[in-house]
């Protein structure tokens, strides 16, 4: 399978992607990780307004193969939850980078996106040459 690695995304070691928009962080899971999970059957996410620490679980993705937790790459408050993904888990599978985003985070302090991998670095980690 051919995966998309948009240049405007950064990635955590645990396969979450981050898109910075106007000081907020849109967080989702990479196409690569979603493909590894297989058919997604259930998504559970933290509540809007929840304040979580970096590395804490903010949700669970259940597939026919496994149940995986998703982790926050930065501390902050969840200001928006993608209810569409909860109601229709296939969105995550069909468009993880577009309509399949998970949460929007207001970071506790200035988030340093530079601490995450660039798209190129992430691609070289997950796609064998």
Curated annotation (Swiss-Prot):
Q: Tell me the keywords, alphabetical order.
A: Lipoyl
- What GO terms in the biological process aspect are recorded for it? glycine decarboxylation via glycine cleavage system
Subunit architecture: The glycine cleavage system is composed of four proteins: P, T, L and H.
What is the protein name given in its UniProt record? Glycine cleavage system H protein
> What does the note under cofactor report?
Binds 1 lipoyl cofactor covalently.
Mind telling me which NCBIfam families this protein's record contains? gcvH, PRK01202.1
Describe the family membership recorded for this protein in Swiss-Prot or TrEMBL.
Belongs to the GcvH family.
**In the record, what lineage is assigned to the organism producing the protein?**
Bacteria, Bacillati, Cyanobacteriota, Cyanophyceae, Synechococcales
Q: Where is the Lipoyl-binding domain?
A: 24-106
Cofactor(s) recorded for this entry are:
(R)-lipoate
Per the UniProt record, the source organism is: Prochlorococcus marinus (strain AS9601)
Gene3D superfamilies found in the cross-reference section: 2.40.50.100
UniProt function note = The glycine cleavage system catalyzes the degradation of glycine. The H protein shuttles the methylamine group of glycine from the P protein to the T protein.
- What Pfam families does the annotation carry? GCV_H
GO CC terms, sorted: cytosol; glycine cleavage complex
Can you tell which superkingdom this protein's organism belongs to?
Answer: Bacteria
| Residues annotated with N6-lipoyllysine modification | 65
- List the InterPro entries: 2-oxoA_DH_lipoyl-BS, Biotin_lipoyl, GCV_H, GCV_H/Fam206, GCV_H_sub, Single_hybrid_motif
């Amino acid at each position: 399978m051919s995966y998309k690695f948009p240049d405007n995304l950064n990635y955590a070691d645990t396969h979450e992607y981050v898109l910075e928009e106007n000081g907020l962080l849109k967080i989702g899971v990479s196409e690569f990780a979603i493909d590894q999970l297989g058919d997604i059957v259930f998504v559970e996410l933290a509540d809007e307004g929840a304040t979580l620490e970096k590395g804490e679980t903010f949700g669970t993705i259940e597939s026919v193969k496994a149940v995986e937790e998703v982790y926050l790459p930065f501390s902050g408050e969840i200001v928006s939850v993608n209810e569409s993904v909860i109601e229709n888990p296939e969105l995550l599978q069909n468009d993880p980078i577009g309509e399949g985003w998970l949460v929007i985070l207001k970071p506790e302090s200035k988030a340093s996106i530079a601490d995450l991998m660039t798209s190129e670095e992430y691609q070289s980690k997950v796609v064998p040459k």
